[in-house]
Amino acid sequence: MKHLVIGAVAAAGLAIGGAASAQEFISIGTGGVTGVYYPTGGAICRLVNKSRKEHGIRCAVESTGGSVYNINTIKAGELEFGVAQSDWQYHAYNGPSSFADNPFPEIRAVMSVHPEPFTLVV
């Protein structure tokens, strides 16, 4: 898993642009500092930064308003990565809900942190 995370972020960072020898800075938008996603983003950045001399990528974690904020900020080009729940990724890609007037079909998932099954009670 550790190598998958480093490889995925490094590959995506290189795809963003810039020479491999130059230092590339990336940010991961997460959620509130008291939630689960902020420490998860911090752990990903620690893994990336541990081997930054090999790939030239420096990672920083940012506390944000969560999934919708992260998606919109990535779309605006202000974040390179963001943690988003899969239902909001679906809405962003397909255009319903908050994204009805402004879908984001270019959004891509790099990895899944954990499964999020849910129960619908009617």
Label each PLM-derived region with a short phrase.
Residues Q23-V122:
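Short, glycine-/small- and polar/acidic-enriched structural segments
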Residues G17-A19:
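N-terminal signal peptide c-region/cleavage motif recognized by signal peptidases
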Residues M1-V5:
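Positively charged n-region of N-terminal signal peptides that target proteins for export
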Residues I6-A15:
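Bacterial N-terminal signal peptides
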